[in-house]
Design a protein with these regions (language model features):
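Hydrophobic alpha-helical and helix-loop surface patches within well-folded domains
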Residues: 164, 176-177
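Asp-box/WD-like beta-propeller blade repeats and closely related beta-sheet repeat scaffolds
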Residues: 67-72
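A flexible loop/linker signature enriched in serine peptidases of the S9 family
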Residues: 2-8, 12-14, 19-28, 34-65, ...
């Protein structure tokens, strides 16, 4: 969890809590890897929000709350502000928002980044007001976006390769918070 801009890990069984980050800047928007050994987060470093990961390094240590050695690594560091990271279901890629409105994906092996949903499809009033979710198979994103140059959000499917965007709702009303079932 995040409190006062720092990341903490807590055991639900033993009421133990450990501070994971300890920086003068903020961290937020955490996302766990499927094996639970890595946490993605947005961190404010050098006057810019970027994407980082922190991992357990010792094989015998299974939980962040009881870890002794952690390794922090930058994932996406650019002049642009980047937020809301999320691991792909297979853990090989990281989705994130650039400048609050552009959905992008970074391949962890190649470090290449591709655009999934362009800026023209979103508008942000504040941090965290944009949502997206990987499909269970990692081939699509469920998104809320602004088609047709209007301000009512529709729910869409955006392909993970960034080549297709399908409007699922075609509604004249505001649609928001879609979920995979």
């Amino acid at each position: 969890f995040v409190a006062h801009g720092e990341i903490f890990g807590t055991s639900i069984d033993y009421s133990e809590t450990k501070r994971i980050t300890n920086t003068p800047e903020q961290e937020r928007n955490i996302s766990f890897s499927s094996d639970g050994r890595t946490i993605l987060f947005a961190g404010e470093r050098n006057e810019s929000w970027n994407i980082y990961q922190i991992s357990l390094t010792r094989e015998e240590e299974k939980y962040f709350y009881s870890s002794t050695v952690l390794k922090e690594e930058p994932i996406v560091v650019t002049a642009a502000e980047t937020y809301q990271p999320a691991f792909s279901p297979d853990g090989k890629e990281v989705a994130f928002l650039e400048e609050r409105v552009i959905l992008k994906v970074n391949n962890l092996a190649t470090k290449e980044t591709r655009t999934i949903l362009e800026k023209k499809y979103n508008y942000s009033y504040s941090d965290g007001d944009q949502t997206y979710e990987w499909s269970p198979d990692g081939k699509w994103f469920l998104v809320v976006y602004l088609p047709y140059n209007r301000w009512n959000g529709d729910v869409g499917l955006a392909s993970a390769d960034g080549k297709r965007l399908i409007n699922l709702t075609e509604s004249g009303y505001e649609c928001y918070k879609p979920k995979w079932m």
